[in-house]
């Protein structure tokens, strides 16, 4: 798996992820780019799960963004509907965190769309709970920027989770 974490703080949203691709208990690649910009750089997206499945979902989600003029929630709900009803899509094993300047969402592998708690922190993947815990502690107890919190949370997850490394891709809005 992997770790993807998103933090929204002081008018900035940051999504970061590690670069490890595993096949069973073997590391296949250490520098995969699991966080991307979509919709002309206005939407950040990060994936956890099967790489091929995630790229399929990135492509489908970007189409939904185009269809709905970049409206994040509407695009996510429409993708989730397709995910639940299309036989081929139902077999995809991946989760997405998506964010724009206004909101952040998780799109789950069963076609659910989840909004964050009041703290505006999201995390997915095998190291997601470690990163989520770290980010919450840092938000509550420090004045660090959203980017610094994402970096530190990913580093903590990478130190604990064997399916997460410390080769990060981090994107932020506004940039």
Curated annotation (Swiss-Prot):
Keywords: Allosteric enzyme, Cytoplasm, Hydrolase, Metal-binding, Protease, Sodium, Threonine protease. Its EC number is 3.4.25.2. GO terms for cellular component: HslUV protease complex; proteasome core complex. It catalyses: ATP-dependent cleavage of peptide bonds with broad specificity. Disulfide bonds: none annotated. It holds the Pfam family Proteasome. One of its GO terms (molecular function) is threonine-type endopeptidase activity. Transmembrane segments: none annotated. It is found in: Cytoplasm. The active site is at residue 2. It comes from the Bacteria. Na(+) binds at residues 158, 161, 164. PROSITE patterns: PROTEASOME_BETA_2. Allosterically activated by HslU binding. Its main location: cytoplasm. One of its GO terms (biological process) is proteolysis involved in protein catabolic process. InterPro entries: ATP-dep_Prtase_HsIV_su, Ntn_hydrolases_N, Proteasome_sua/b, Proteasome_suB-type. NCBIfam families: ATP_dep_HslV (TIGR03692), PRK05456.1 (NF003964). HAMAP family: HslV (MF_00248). A double ring-shaped homohexamer of HslV is capped on each side by a ring-shaped HslU homohexamer. The assembly of the HslU/HslV complex is dependent on binding of ATP. Belongs to the peptidase T1B family. HslV subfamily. Protease subunit of a proteasome-like degradation complex believed to be a general protein degrading machinery. This is ATP-dependent protease subunit HslV. It comes from Haemophilus influenzae (strain PittGG). The lineage of its organism: Bacteria, Pseudomonadati, Pseudomonadota, Gammaproteobacteria, Pasteurellales.
């Amino acid at each position: 798996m992997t770790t993807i974490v998103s933090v929204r703080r002081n008018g900035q949203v940051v999504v970061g992820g590690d670069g490890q691709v595993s096949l069973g208990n073997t590391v296949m690649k250490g520098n995969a780019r699991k966080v991307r910009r979509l919709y002309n750089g206005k939407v950040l997206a990060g994936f956890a799960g099967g790489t091929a499945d995630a790229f399929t979902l990135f492509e489908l989600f970007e189409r939904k963004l185009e269809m709905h003029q970049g409206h994040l929630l509407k695009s996510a709900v429409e993708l989730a509907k397709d995910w639940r009803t299309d036989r081929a899509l139902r077999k995809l094993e991946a989760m997405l965190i998506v964010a724009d300047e206004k909101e952040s969402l998780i799109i789950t592998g069963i076609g659910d769309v989840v909004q964050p708690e009041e703290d505006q922190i999201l995390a997915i993947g095998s190291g997601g709970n470690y990163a989520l815990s770290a980010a919450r502690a840092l938000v509550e107890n420090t004045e660090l920027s959203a980017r610094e919190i994402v970096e530190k949370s990913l580093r903590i997850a990478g130190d604990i989770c064997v399916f997460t490394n410390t080769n990060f891709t981090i994107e932020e809005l506004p940039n």
